[in-house]
């Protein structure tokens, strides 16, 4: 069931709290590990092994009608956001920053970009294809995904991104403009505010640090 704004508001702050606390505790723990990036989210101890929060391998449909999973792309680092094409507020700002990330890493085969629409009613595969074409980007590098609404909302939760059905919000959605960094094991390793160019500039070094540690 798709969540309403009232039910999601509590989840929104819960996720922010989880990410913040996890980030602070693990950041302290990483000081003796060459300042490695933290793992965000809850972790479990199973048979003595630490199991970090992992984004599930959802089945998605891209702008070319291909059904894929994250694991379809092999050992990549992923930069992901959630948007919808008719969004009149934060999405155009986030798009500009995603384009900056695309330009910076377009020749780096280790990095891919994922944009997930939260408006399944209007953002069909055909619309996503046209949107990608108008951006002029390589869709082998930057994928535009759709899926069943419940799946996309659940995926956003796993990325720690707030997505809410809200009739009072522009076009009926209230959502976060965060850009999320995922390592090749689908662990959330960092994020930036996609509406803030300075946050994205600082994020470059975060991505570079992950690449340096993931591909030693």
Model-derived segments and spans:
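Bacterial N-terminal signal peptides that target proteins for export
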Residues: 2-17
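C-terminal motif of bacterial Sec signal peptides marking the signal peptidase cleavage site
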Residues: 25-29
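Bacterial signal peptide processing site
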Residues: 30-34
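N-terminal "domain-start" segment that seeds a small globular fold
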Residues: 35-71, 96
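Short loop/turn microsegments at loop-to-beta-strand junctions
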Residues: 55-56, 78, 176-178
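Short active-site neighborhood of thiol/selenol oxidoreductases, capturing the structured segment around
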Residues: 68-98, 114
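Structural microenvironment flanking redox-active thiols in thiol-disulfide oxidoreductases
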Residues: 95-155
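Thiol-/selenol-based redox modules, centered on thioredoxin-like
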Residues: 167-216
């Amino acid at each position: 069931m798709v969540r309403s704004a009232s039910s999601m508001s509590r989840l929104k702050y819960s996720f922010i709290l989880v990410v913040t606390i996890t980030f602070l505790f693990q950041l302290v723990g990483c000081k003796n590990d060459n300042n490695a990036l933290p793992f965000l989210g809850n972790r479990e101890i199973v048979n003595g092994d630490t199991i970090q929060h992992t984004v599930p391998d959802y089945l998605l449909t891209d702008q070319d009608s291909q059904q894929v999973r994250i694991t379809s792309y092999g050992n990549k680092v992923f930069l992901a956001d959630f948007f919808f094409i008719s969004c009149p507020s934060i999405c155009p700002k986030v798009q500009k920053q995603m384009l900056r990330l695309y330009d910076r890493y377009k020749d780096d085969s280790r990095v891919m970009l994922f944009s997930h629409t939260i408006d399944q009613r209007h953002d069909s595969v055909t619309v996503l294809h046209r949107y990608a074409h108008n951006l002029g980007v390589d869709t082998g590098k930057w994928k535009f995904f759709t899926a069943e609404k419940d799946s996309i909302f659940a995926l956003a939760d796993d990325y720690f991104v707030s997505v809410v059905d809200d009739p009072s919000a522009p076009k009926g959605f209230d959502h976060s403009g965060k850009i999320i960094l995922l390592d090749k094991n689908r662990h959330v390793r960092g994020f930036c505010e996609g509406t803030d160019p300075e946050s994205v500039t600082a994020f470059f070094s975060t991505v570079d640090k992950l690449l340096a540690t993931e591909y030693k």
